[in-house]
């Protein structure tokens, strides 16, 4: 009896399954609010995630099966999915543009609204005021954060002429060495993924400098991503299918992990 009791107390903790760590973010919506923290890959890192447009400005508009696709809704959904991926890897995340009702959505056509705020503040209609507002919030949070690796990620959905299919394009601020490195690591990750999942298609996305307001006026190292052409019928598949939106978020997260890992080498 003593031997059996001894085995129970010694082996039980070893055999018991370790309870997974979890977090909760209401902005993800009821179905996705709770997430598991599966690794510490991004422990000590902090991210400022900004989806394009929002509030009174829907951004680019495409037509899919007779219904409108609004850029701000798709950029926001992907930002939320990216935030969840980063949090699951142990990162600290600030979601700058917020809609307390939407959450992560799995539908094809994401209904448009003007509810979005910038950290709770109404979003101005004036473009410069709108961009300044989000940059000011990023910079304010940046000054408070003590993390050693801090990055801002801006996500948009490109709207070129209807006939052009686009890939994913990565931009960094002029002369930003760290921004360029992050953009390159994201690009290489996408290139590998396309080679694996669509080997006959090829990946034609590029990395380049771009003198954008948000890249010039944010303090943390920043990248700006154009995720597709919302007006192109073929390219719309990258946006309307939930699995594709999730894949975009996954790949961006993997590229970020790669970028951080290279610093530690």
What kind of region is each of these model predictions?
Residues 2-263:
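Catalytic-site microenvironment of enzymes
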């Amino acid at each position: 009896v003593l031997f059996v009791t001894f085995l129970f107390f010694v082996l039980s903790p070893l055999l018991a399954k370790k309870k997974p760590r979890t977090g909760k973010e209401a902005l993800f919506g009821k179905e996705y609010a709770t997430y598991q923290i599966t690794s510490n890959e991004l422990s000590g890192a902090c991210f400022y995630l900004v989806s394009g447009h929002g509030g009174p400005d829907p951004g680019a508009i495409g037509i899919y099966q007779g219904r409108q696709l609004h850029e701000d809704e798709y950029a926001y959904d992907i930002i939320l999915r990216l935030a969840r991926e980063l949090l699951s890897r142990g990162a600290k995340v600030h979601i700058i543009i917020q809609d307390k009702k939407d959450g992560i959505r799995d539908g094809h056509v994401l209904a448009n609204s003007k509810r979005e705020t910038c950290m709770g503040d109404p979003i101005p209609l004036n473009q410069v005021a709108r961009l300044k507002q989000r940059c000011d919030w990023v910079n304010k949070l940046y000054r408070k954060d003590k993390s050693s690796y801090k990055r801002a990620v801006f996500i948009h959905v490109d709207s070129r002429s209807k006939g052009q299919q686009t890939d994913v394009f990565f931009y960094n601020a002029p002369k930003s060495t760290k921004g360029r490195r992050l953009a390159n690591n994201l690009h290489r990750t996408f290139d590998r993924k396309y080679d694996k999942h669509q080997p006959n298609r090829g990946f034609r996305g590029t990395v380049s400098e771009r003198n954008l307001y948000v890249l010039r006026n944010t303090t943390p190292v920043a990248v700006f991503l154009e995720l597709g052409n919302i007006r192109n019928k073929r390219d719309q598949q990258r946006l309307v299918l939930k699995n594709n939106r999730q894949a975009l978020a996954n790949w961006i997260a993997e590229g970020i992990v790669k970028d951080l890992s290279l610093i530690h080498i």
